[in-house]
UniProtKB/Swiss-Prot annotation:
Keywords, comma-separated and alphabetical: ANK repeat, Chaperone, Repeat
ANK repeats: 45-75, 79-108, 112-141, 144-173, 177-206, 210-232
The organism of origin for this protein: Dictyostelium discoideum
Pfam families to which the protein is assigned, alphabetical: Ank_2
Record-given protein name: 26S proteasome non-ATPase regulatory subunit 10
Function text: Acts as a chaperone during the assembly of the 26S proteasome, specifically of the 19S regulatory complex (RC).
Lineage: Eukaryota, Amoebozoa, Evosea, Eumycetozoa, Dictyostelia
Superkingdom of origin: Eukaryota
SMART domains for the chain: ANK (SM00248)
């Protein structure tokens, strides 16, 4: 990838990175426009200033880097993370919106095969999930075979599960262990998510690799009752 690498040690690139993190736009502009520091320079982990602006939620800095400096929102660090992945993982809704407006790829995949949709779903951020789906995010599986709806079911966010299902997530998708979202929600005793999945037609009879159905996964008597009732 293009760009100058920098490491800690008091260089101007180090200064740029620190100013980006704390949102000091005037200092960022001075280093780039007057002192010759490249706006797309990289640290030892291949992260650009835009990665850090995204991770820290520094909107004005990110806007400047993309608008004035033409920094790409789709540059990968050494783990395959883009600024959008960083912003999503950190839960910065307005940053996610800005990056998408500047053409960030909602289906970017990191080294764990996780997309921004996985991270938003893991954190139960239905607002960010909605933004990503509206901009064309797909329900893909990561390296554990988990789709975003598995992550949302683990988190326990009904709103996120509902939005993913509206976005055509496969309610009976299985991960590498053979678990469906219903298995996951039952295992974590998320009663509301279990009820939501059941109402949307989740299959209660699917067995995972341990030959367990969702009802076998839960220690909650309420969940066991719900599943039994929906099986009738």
């Amino acid at each position: 990838m293009s760009g100058t690498k920098f490491r800690t040690g008091g260089t101007k690139e180090d200064d740029l990175l620190e100013f980006v993190k704390v949102g000091k736009l005037l200092e960022v502009k001075d280093l780039i426009e007057n002192q010759g520091v490249k706006a797309d320079c990289k640290d030892e982990d291949e992260r650009t200033p835009l990665h850090w602006a995204a991770a820290k939620g520094q909107i004005s800095v990110a806007q400047y880097l993309m608008d004035n400096c033409k920094c790409s929102p789709n540059t990968n660090d050494d783990g395959g993370w883009t600024p959008l992945t960083s912003a999503t993982s950190a839960g910065h809704t307005h940053m996610v919106k800005l990056l998408l407006e500047f053409g960030a790829d909602p289906n970017t995949v990191n080294d764990s095969k996780r997309t921004p949709l996985h991270y938003a779903s893991s954190k139960g951020r239905s607002d960010i999930v909605d933004l990503l789906l509206t901009h064309g995010a797909k329900n893909r599986k990561d390296d554990t075979g988990s789709a975003p709806i598995h992550r949302a079911s683990s988190n326990g966010s009904v709103a996120t599960v509902e939005r993913l299902l509206k976005g055509e997530a496969n309610i009976n998708s299985t991960n590498n262990e053979g678990d469906t979202p219903l298995h996951i929600a039952a295992e974590y005793n998320h009663e509301d998510v279990v009820e939501c999945l059941l109402k949307h037609g989740a299959d209660t009879t699917i067995e995972n690799k341990d030959s367990k159905t969702p009802i076998d996964m839960s220690s909650s008597q309420t969940i066991k009752y719900l599943i039994k009732e929906f099986k009738k």
